[in-house]
Amino acid sequence: MRRAELNVTDPARIAEILNKCDCCRVGFWDGEEVYLVPMSFGWEKAGGKYTLWFHGAGEGRKAALARQCPRVSFEMDCGHGLRGAEMACGFTTAYQCIMGTGRLVPAETAEDKQRGLDAVMAHYAPGQTWTFPQEMLERTNVYRLEAETLSCKVHP
C-alpha cells in the first residue's frame, strides 16, 4: 500500500468496517475480462482468517465463473464523503475500504449452507434467528470465500 498511514491492521477496526459495508463486489476472471458482481455477504473470523459468505442461483454467468475459475478478488467500501477545497486539485474523498483475494468454493453440505446463510443474515439482521427450508437449501448456491489476502484502508 502506497500510503501506509492509511492502512488499518487492528482486527476490531476491520470488524467495524466489515459490519458497516452493505455490499461486497466480487471480481471474476473469465479468461478475457473481469466480471464484477455486487453481492450481499456475511463474514466470520476464526484463527486469524477472514471468511466471507455469499449466496446466489445455481445457474448464470456468476455460477459458471465460480466453477470455472474460483480465484477471485473482492472489494467493499463505506463511509464515503466528498471533501471540497478551494482548488479542484484539492478535492478528495473520505472512505473506508477492504480489498483482498481468495478462492470462492461452494458449500457442499446442508450444514455448510446453513452456516453461510446464517452469516449473511447476521450481517443484515443481527440478533435474529432464521430457519431455511430444506428445499431452499438444496436449490440455493452458497459460497465460502476464504480470504488469502485482505487489506483495509481508511482515508479520513
Range-by-range predicted roles:
Residues M1-N19:
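Extreme N-terminal tail/first-helix region
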Residues V26, R71-M76:
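Short conserved beta-strand and strand-loop elements enriched in small hydrophobics
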Residues Y50-V72:
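Compact nucleic-acid interaction/catalytic patches
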Residues C21-G58:
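Short beta-strand segments
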Residues R61, A66, D77, L82-G84:
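Cyclic nucleotide-binding regulatory domains
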Residues L18, L65-A66, V120:
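A generic structural signal for nonpolar/aromatic side chains embedded in well-ordered alpha-helices
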Residues V8-D10, K20-R25, P126-Q128:
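Short Pro/Gly-enriched beta-strand edge/turn motifs at strand-loop
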Residues R2-E5, G79-P156:
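Charged, gly/pro-rich active-site loop segments
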